């Protein structure tokens, strides 16, 4: 069952993503998990390499000062430098650059991408576990109306894009930003210490003593960086909104393309390329409009950042040391070294400005992920979840298997409606009974089967299932996932639960002996089984699954619609022979129900839907199929 009313009210619900419904909960979930040693171990290595990179920035500034000073004094009349000294300084600078970029930065990138890969994999497993749980959360999220989830985005759109792209972008962005924060802190420590160490007095600021030039550097940074940071934050807010819109538009367009590829035959058969082309144009128009706005903002931000970098590195960085240099308190080498250190401080403090687009994307990705986590948690109580869009008072219970299946005062409704479109009083299907479910097309036969199996959200009444009896629901539309043929037969069991011989025997009994050698294959000729098999072959595959799993309670929704009369009889006879004692409820549109080769009836009774009411009669009373109201009501 999808949900049981008694158990839902008694047990608290918690999913594998419960802690990820807030920004910081999402950020820290991995670091507090059972993989914390892996996470913190990689993080520690990254911090150490970041510290070494910060120290290398100090070495770089000192080496740059030595090289510029050596070049400046090459033609000094009293104490000229030699070419050997210049080459030695250049070699030292080159060595520092190689060690910093290759030994520190490149290896840090390797460890950070490894952390990115492992963090993403952990989150991917958690969200897949939450969506593909026994509560069928993925189904509820797809069925829920837009107003069913009280979040800003309601039922999350493009769940695939959120799990694939948003998680990847969020984890990568978070790691990059964390490295940036660590780099700023460590660089301020090492570079700031060097600035204080090389500080000197400045005229007019004698009361600061030897810390005069250091204070000037701090003042220049404090005056320059915050104003620019505020402007960057405003632009970042706009970019975050555009990023969210862009992800939604891209996800919708990709979803329609994927749907086309899965249904290309139906589009071709209906000559629906024009309609599909129009849909794609509308989807891409949304992408293009959002992209244009994003490009304008990116260009504005790029111009702002380039101007900011130039003034910071060429004017602000060199200004604090200019006064003591003019007063001849420091040498040219000390002046250049101080300017490079000031430039490093400005770059570090400007980290927020440089990564503002990344922060905007991080927040956009995190918002889409946390909204999905909220929706997953919200759908853990399906009755309350669906009650926001209509009556959701269906109750599910269990009873002794010998009493079979019982339906009590059942009413099925559409979202937002108060009147039922299908009603049933007290109905009982005995253990081992075969019951035919008939009614006009659209009268609610499939909806009734869905409701019995917990897949219809709105209505009232009680459904009592036999306890500890395996059920199998064969839906009307058969869509096969891209897995091996054996896995398709074994669903919902694990593939290891049944031997190759058992699976091969089930295939043969179902009339698919030609495919026995392909049990381990996921298709043929670059086509999946869903693309390769015909409608009749898919129904035979469902029969093979039934024969392998041997359920005690079987629900069939037009199971032989693609089979001829002889194959239909063989289908029913195989179930009768190999699933002895099973209870069967089957939807069929045939004018007369099938009989065995000896003329015996397969079915014992009939559930008839007429004028929206379900009644049960013996099979002998079946005359013609009744006419009922359409299941999908026309809008007024």
Segment roles from a protein language model:
Residues 1-57, 69-93, 108-112, 138-185, ...:
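Membrane-integrated ABC transporters
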Residues 453:
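Helix-to-loop junction immediately C-terminal to a conserved catalytic motif
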Residues 548-552, 581:
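A short, proline-enriched helix->beta-strand linker immediately N-terminal to the Walker B motif
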Residues 169, 242-262, 268-316, 358-361, ...:
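An intracellular "coupling" helix at the cytosolic face of ABC transporter transmembrane type-1 domains
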């Amino acid at each position: 069952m999808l949900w049981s009313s008694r158990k839902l009210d008694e047990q608290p619900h918690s999913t594998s993503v419960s802690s990820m419904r807030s920004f910081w909960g999402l950020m820290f979930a991995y670091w507090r998990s059972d993989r914390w040693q892996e996470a913190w171990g990689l993080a520690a290595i990254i911090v150490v390499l970041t510290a070494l990179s910060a120290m290398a920035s100090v070495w770089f500034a000192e080496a740059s000062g030595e090289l510029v000073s050596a070049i400046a004094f090459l033609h000094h009349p009293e104490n000229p430098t030699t070419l050997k000294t210049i080459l030695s300084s250049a070699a030292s600078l080159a060595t520092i650059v190689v060690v910093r970029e290759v030994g520190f930065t490149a290896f840090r990138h390797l460890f950070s991408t490894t952390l990115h890969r492992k963090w993403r994999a952990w989150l991917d497993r958690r969200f897949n576990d939450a969506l593909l749980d026994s509560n069928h959360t993925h189904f509820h999220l797809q069925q829920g109306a837009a107003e069913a989830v009280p979040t800003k985005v309601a039922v999350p759109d493009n769940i695939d894009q959120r799990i694939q792209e948003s998680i990847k972008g969020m984890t990568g962005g978070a790691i990059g930003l964390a490295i940036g924060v660590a780099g700023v802190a460590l660089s301020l420590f090492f570079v700031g210490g060097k600035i204080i160490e090389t500080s000197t007095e400045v005229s007019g600021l004698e009361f600061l003593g030897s810390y005069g030039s250091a204070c000037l550097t701090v003042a220049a940074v404090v005056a320059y960086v915050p104003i620019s940071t505020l402007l960057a934050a405003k632009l970042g807010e706009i970019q975050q909104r555009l990023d969210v819109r862009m992800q939604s538009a891209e996800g919708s367009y990709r979803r329609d393309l994927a749907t086309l590829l899965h249904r290309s035959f139906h589009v071709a058969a209906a000559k629906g390329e024009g309609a599909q082309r129009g849909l794609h144009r509308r989807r891409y128009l949304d992408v293009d409009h959002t992209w244009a706005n994003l490009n304008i903002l990116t260009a504005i931000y790029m111009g702002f950042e380039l101007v900011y970098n130039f003034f910071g590195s060429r004017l602000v960085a060199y200004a604090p040391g200019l006064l003591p240099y003019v007063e001849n308190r420091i040498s040219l080498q000390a002046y250049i070294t101080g300017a490079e250190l000031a430039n490093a401080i400005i770059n570090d403090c400007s980290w927020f400005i440089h990564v503002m687009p990344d922060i905007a994307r991080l927040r956009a990705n995190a918002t889409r992920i946390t909204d999905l986590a909220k929706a997953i948690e919200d759908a853990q109580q399906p009755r309350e979840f669906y009650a926001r869009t209509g009556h959701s008072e269906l109750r599910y219970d269990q009873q002794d298997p010998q009493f079979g299946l019982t339906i009590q005062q059942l009413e099925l409704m559409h979202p937002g409606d108060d009147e039922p479109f299908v009603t049933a009083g007290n109905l009982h299907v005995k253990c081992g009974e075969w019951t035919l479910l008939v009614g006009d097309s659209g009268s609610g036969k499939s909806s009734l089967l869905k409701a019995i199996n917990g897949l219809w959200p709105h209505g009232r009444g009680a459904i009592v299932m036999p306890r500890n009896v395996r059920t199998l629901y064969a839906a009307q539309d058969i869509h096969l996932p891209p897995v091996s043929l054996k896995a398709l037969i074994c669903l919902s069991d694990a593939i290891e639960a049944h031997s190759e011989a058992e699976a091969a025997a089930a295939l043969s009994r179902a009339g698919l002996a030609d495919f026995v050698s392909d049990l381990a294959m996921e298709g043929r000729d670059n086509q999946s089984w869903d693309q390769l098999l015909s409608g009749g072959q898919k129904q035979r595959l469902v029969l093979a699954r039934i024969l392998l799993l041997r359920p005690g309670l079987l629900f069939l929704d037009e199971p032989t619609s693609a089979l001829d009369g002889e194959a239909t009889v063989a289908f029913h006879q195989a179930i009768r022979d190999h699933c002895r004692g099973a209870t069967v409820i089957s939807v069929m549109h045939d004018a007369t129900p099938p009989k065995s080769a000896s003329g015996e009836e397969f079915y014992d009774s009939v559930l008839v839907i007429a004028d929206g009411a379900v009644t049960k009669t013996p099979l002998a009373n079946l005359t013609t199929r009744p006419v009922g109201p359409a299941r999908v009501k026309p809008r007024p």
